[in-house]
């Protein structure tokens, strides 16, 4: 295996492992986040299931963590055997999976960020109050969880780029370079 291939595999492996860690951390932080307030003798509990965008984030991060863990195992096995991906159909499958994971998680982050801004700032035109004024601990832990999910999403975008490079270099290697005018 060439040095550049080894470095690419190592980078991909580190990114995939970080995706698994950050996505799992986000999942744990968000799912375990609750806060109870007593409002006029009525107990009100804030939990992640109250906002559907956050439920979407939890599901997306769960899928991403498992997918990245499985792909990490594939990277380790490929590195140990010293093989680089040469199959175009398999490269397309990995590329498509990586793209789907990246888009899914970026969409989940965007939806959750919008819900978070509304919870923090409220919406005066619709008379929605600021929820984070009442549930400060809940909002702070949720923000940390969403930040972890954002880091996982950024790593997914980079993995997607590596996957695209791995796929499209399979097509560039078969061209006869002597016939190009450049």
Swiss-Prot record:
InterPro entries from the UniProt entry: CASP/CASPL (IPR006459), CASP_dom (IPR006702)
Key words of the record: Cell membrane, Membrane, Transmembrane, Transmembrane helix
Keyword flag Transmembrane helix: yes
Coiled coil regions in record: none
Residue spans crossing the bilayer: 13-31, 53-73, 90-110, 142-162
Any single GO CC term annotated in Swiss-Prot or TrEMBL for this entry: plasma membrane
Record keyword Membrane present: yes
Membrane topology: Multi-pass membrane protein
Cytoplasmic side: 1-12, 74-89, 163-182
Extracellular domain ranges by topology: 32-52, 111-141
Subcellular location: Cell membrane
PANTHER family hit by this protein: CASP-LIKE PROTEIN 2B1, CASP-LIKE PROTEIN 4A4
Family to which the UniProt record says this protein belongs: Belongs to the Casparian strip membrane proteins (CASP) family.
Complexes and interactors: Homodimer and heterodimers.
Name of the protein: CASP-like protein 2B1
């Amino acid at each position: 295996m060439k040095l550049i291939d080894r470095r690419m595999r190592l980078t991909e492996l580190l990114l995939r492992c970080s995706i698994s860690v950050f996505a799992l951390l986000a999942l744990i932080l968000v799912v375990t986040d609750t806060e109870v307030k007593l409002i006029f003798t009525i107990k009100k509990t804030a939990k992640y299931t109250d906002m559907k965008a956050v439920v979407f984030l939890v599901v997306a991060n769960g899928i991403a963590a498992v997918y990245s863990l499985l792909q990490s195992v594939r990277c380790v096995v490929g590195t140990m055997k010293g093989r680089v991906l040469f199959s175009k159909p398999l490269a397309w499958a990995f590329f498509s999976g990586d793209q789907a994971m990246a888009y899914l998680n970026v969409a989940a982050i965007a939806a959750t960020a919008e819900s978070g801004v509304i919870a923090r700032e409220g919406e005066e035109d619709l008379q929605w109050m600021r929820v984070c004024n009442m549930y400060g601990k809940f909002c702070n832990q949720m923000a940390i969880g969403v930040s972890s999910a954002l880091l996982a999403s950024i790593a997914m975008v980079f993995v997607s780029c590596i996957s695209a490079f791995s796929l499209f270099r399979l097509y560039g290697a078969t061209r006869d370079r002597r016939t190009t005018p450049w």
